[in-house]
């Protein structure tokens, strides 16, 4: 828990690389339960997505994808978060906003999220709002 508090302090000071190092230390611990790994990976990925958007900086996409890959597919409770994060990183990877409409992989990911009964309505609503924004620009 203290490392997670340190991570937040580093993020508040814009010390993102230090935060990533601490996340990697936590996530590489051998004795952690897969649920705990998933929760920490999700938290880290969302924080890095936020940083990428806030600072218009895509340098952390590979780290985000690494964190996403640590979310166990057998943990149904986290599939909505995992799919939303995949969707968000796909958007961050676009060359420009107008290429959204022509990206079949991204549109397919959107459809899978919206049609998946195991994904919460909250996540679906967030993804739907983002989708509508990109469709109408």
Label for each model-derived stretch:
Residues 1-9, 42-47:
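Non-membrane alpha-helical segments in proteins
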Residues 13-14, 22-137:
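Soluble extracytoplasmic domains of inner/organellar membrane proteins
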């Amino acid at each position: 828990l203290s490392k997670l508090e340190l991570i937040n302090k580093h993020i508040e000071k814009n010390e993102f690389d230090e935060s990533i190092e601490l996340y990697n230390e936590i996530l590489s611990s051998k004795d952690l339960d897969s649920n705990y790994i998933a929760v920490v990976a999700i938290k880290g990925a969302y924080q890095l997505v936020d940083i990428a958007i806030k600072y218009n900086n895509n340098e952390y996409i590979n780290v985000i994808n690494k964190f996403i890959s640590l979310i166990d597919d057998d943990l149904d409770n986290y599939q909505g978060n995992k799919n939303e994060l995949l969707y968000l990183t796909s958007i961050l990877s676009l060359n420009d906003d107008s290429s959204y409409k022509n990206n079949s992989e991204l549109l397919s990911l959107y459809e899978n999220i919206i049609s998946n009964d195991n994904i919460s309505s909250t996540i679906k609503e967030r993804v739907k709002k983002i989708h509508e924004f990109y469709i109408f620009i």
